[in-house]
């Protein structure tokens, strides 16, 4: 079984080596790892130097460079299209964050998860899930969004906004075949809605969500406003097409 790992990255040259250093102990060296990198030139160079050292050890790692900050959704979508064009026979594609919030343990667990699904979401809100290091206000906001968005979109999941996901080959093909309405983090909600409408199977598994290793969140006020507008756009179009 071949699994591709896609990691969107924005100036995370410090945290990504920590994440990959632990992950590659249990990652098949022949399975591709694609870094969708929107970092500035300094961060990009440091990242490339580290990734080259992993290539020298035999790991199959590639970088898909963005000239600007494309937003998470656009970066991952481009990496998916690259995977579909260059590694056509893969079984699954996993998306995970570069900042250390997604544990390598959970990535490996989802890779090896035996129950078949088209979209497998690592959820922060199942019985055995945990969130480490979040303030009460951040928990409340996340919990609210993950209640209201699935409710309005009629998707039975507990965590529609987390970016730790495993896609079947079919799901990756489908989400790359349409023109998305949004970018950034709200793209995750749009993507789940599209997969549901294609009558593909969505499942969740519990994960432990960790604090980012370095720095603070790269999500800006502009990103949040854009996400809210994107959600309204998805909801409006979803209702109009019913």
Indicate where each model-derived feature is located.
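Acceptor/aglycone-binding surface of glycosyltransferases and processive sugar-polymer synthases
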Residues: 61, 66-83, 92, 102-183, ...
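A short, exposed helix-loop element centered on a Lys and neighboring polar residues
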Residues: 10
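Short beta-strand/loop segment that forms part of the nucleotide-sugar
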Residues: 30-41, 64-66
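Short loop->beta transition adjacent to catalytic acidic/histidine clusters or analogous donor-positioning motifs
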Residues: 2-3, 24-34, 59-61, 91
């Amino acid at each position: 079984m071949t699994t591709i790992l896609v990691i969107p990255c924005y100036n995370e040259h410090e945290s990504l080596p920590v994440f990959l250093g632990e992950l590659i102990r249990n990652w098949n060296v022949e399975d591709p790892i694609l870094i969708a990198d929107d970092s500035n030139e300094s961060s990009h160079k440091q990242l490339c130097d580290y990734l080259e050292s992993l290539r020298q050890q035999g790991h199959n790692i590639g970088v898909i460079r963005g000239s600007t900050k494309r937003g998470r959704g656009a970066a991952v979508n481009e990496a998916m299209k690259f995977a579909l064009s260059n590694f056509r026979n893969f079984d699954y594609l996993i998306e995970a964050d570069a900042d250390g919030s997604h544990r390598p343990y959970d990535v490996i667990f989802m890779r090896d998860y035996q129950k078949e699904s088209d979209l497998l979401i690592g959820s922060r809100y199942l019985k055995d899930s945990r969130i480490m290091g979040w303030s009460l206000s951040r928990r409340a906001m996340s919990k609210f969004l993950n209640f209201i968005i699935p409710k309005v979109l009629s998707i039975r999941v507990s965590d529609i906004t987390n970016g730790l996901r495993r896609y079947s080959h079919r799901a990756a093909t489908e989400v790359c075949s349409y023109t998305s309405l949004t970018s950034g983090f709200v793209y995750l909600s749009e993507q789940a809605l599209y997969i549901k409408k294609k009558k593909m199977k969505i499942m969740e598994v519990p994960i432990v969500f960790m604090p980012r290793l370095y720095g603070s969140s790269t999500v800006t006020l502009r990103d949040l406003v854009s996400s809210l507008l994107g959600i309204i756009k998805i909801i409006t179009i979803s209702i109009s097409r019913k």
